[in-house]
Amino acid sequence: MSEYRIKVAPNTVAYADAENHKLVVEFAIPGAPTATIDVKILEDSIHLTAPARDIEYVSALALAWPVKPEKAEAIYEHGLLRIEVPFKDPMEDAVKVAVKASGPDIKAE
């Protein structure tokens, strides 16, 4: 039989570091061994699970602005997990659309 842990939402702070164009998220997860922390990041969300003694920290955050998950960095120190991930340029994947004239072309002045 697997060990049951009570699921607990960690204290969380998330803010935009506008100067460095990054999202910073901090999770307070004291007692969680580094090797058991599981963080998954998508462009629009962050998911965390971290077992610690008789509890399991769990969190799922929906992000208002897309990020670049492949460039995320995470540091765990003194029970605080800090994640920094750059924001994605909203035009990064934009596709240029060719415009055709349907009548006489207007000349640029």
Where are these regions (language model features)?
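Alpha-crystallin/small heat shock protein
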Residues: 1-109
